[in-house]
């Protein structure tokens, strides 16, 4: 959990726990995940305490992912490759996005508007995970239109101007 900086013994134990996700990803032995780091929480205002310590003085331990790796992970989740079907339905629900305009208006952080799903027909089904922070606008989207095969798209952008561009990804 987050909190103030820790003494060295507790900090080392905390780091081991935080790195477990990276150990699991490494154990998959997928080339798309080489050099990935998914051990950091995301922050609106920046990390503090032990989280800031863990990022490193120059943020050298920040999260680092790729579009290829994100595509592989998301497809594997959606096709039940890495988590058996009965066990990942809850996870899929977390990624499910409503395309209904009324529902989207009620949720300003809906991860559809300003992202890949915004341009889809309302009859489609969408599962996605957007990332929007001060310098990145990312999206991983899996959708299925009626009577069509599922589609997957992954877009990562970097730059303060692109972060503000609400029309870049839905285009």
Language model feature labels by segment:
Residues 62-67, 71-171:
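Structured C-terminal helix/loop/strand segments within mature extracytoplasmic catalytic/sensor domains
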Residues 1-71, 76:
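Active-site-adjacent helix/loop patches that line small-molecule binding or acyl-intermediate pockets
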């Amino acid at each position: 959990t987050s909190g103030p900086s820790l003494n060295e013994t507790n900090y080392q134990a905390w780091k081991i726990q935080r790195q477990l996700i990276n150990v699991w990803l490494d154990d998959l032995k997928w080339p798309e995940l080489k050099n990935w780091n998914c051990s950091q929480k995301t922050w609106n205002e920046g990390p503090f305490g032990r989280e800031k310590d863990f990022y490193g003085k120059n943020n050298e331990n920040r999260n680092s992912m790729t579009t290829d790796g994100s595509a592989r992970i998301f497809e594997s989740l959606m096709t039940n490759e890495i988590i058996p079907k009965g066990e990942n339905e809850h996870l899929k629900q977390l990624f499910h996005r409503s395309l209904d305009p009324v529902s989207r208006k009620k949720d300003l952080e809906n991860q559809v508007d300003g992202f890949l799903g915004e341009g889809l027909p309302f009859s489609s089904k969408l599962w996605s995970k957007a990332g929007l922070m001060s310098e990145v606008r990312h999206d991983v989207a899996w959708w299925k239109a009626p009577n069509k095969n599922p589609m997957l798209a992954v877009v990562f952008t970097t730059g303060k101007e692109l972060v503000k561009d609400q029309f870049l990804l839905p285009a």
